[in-house]
Amino acid sequence: MASVLEIPFYDADDFHLQANIEKMKQGISLQDVDRESWLDTLTNNLAKWETAAGAVLACSALKETYRTVLQSGVENDVTWVYLYGRSKLIKERMAGRKGHYFKPDLVDSQFADLEPPQYGWHFNISSSSDYIVKSILDKLRHTD
């Protein structure tokens, strides 16, 4: 998506504190308090990216409160794209991420915390990535 739009891509996982990464490596779920500094960092970066050309941020943003914090850092509305899928498929994809610290076993705890957004564009990840990217681009063109 980012390469097609010619803007930077960021993975929110890259902004976690080392202590949180260690917890996840051990299979320990993060709590809201663990995510506070991570959300602050992402919010500050969103403001910087907004003043540049924009960016694509891949971020779990599991709860509405997290999304509210992230939106608060920018002047314009965030274009929210919610990618959803079955736990089994997500675990399979997580297991295929070589060298990533997040254990597929933690997916269940994320599903337990998940508050799906009632807004934005929703896509099932069982669709091809090409289809999802094309659909998002079509929606972006019709939003301007």
Model segments located where?
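Conserved substrate/cofactor phosphate-moiety recognition/catalytic segment
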Residues: 2-44
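Conserved beta-strand scaffold positions in the cores of enzyme catalytic domains, especially
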Residues: 9-14, 78-80, 120-122
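Conserved nucleotide-binding/hydrolysis micro-motifs of P-loop NTPases
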Residues: 16, 61-63, 85-89
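Glycine-rich phosphate-binding loop used to anchor ATP phosphates in small-molecule kinases
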Residues: 33-75, 83
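Short amphipathic alpha-helical segments
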Residues: 67-71, 92-95, 136
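Conserved phosphate-donor/acceptor-positioning beta-strand/loop module used by diverse small-molecule
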Residues: 74-93
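Small-molecule kinase domains that catalyze NTP-dependent phosphoryl transfer to phosphate-bearing small molecules
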Residues: 96-137
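Generic C-terminal helix-cap and adjacent flexible tail
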Residues: 138-144
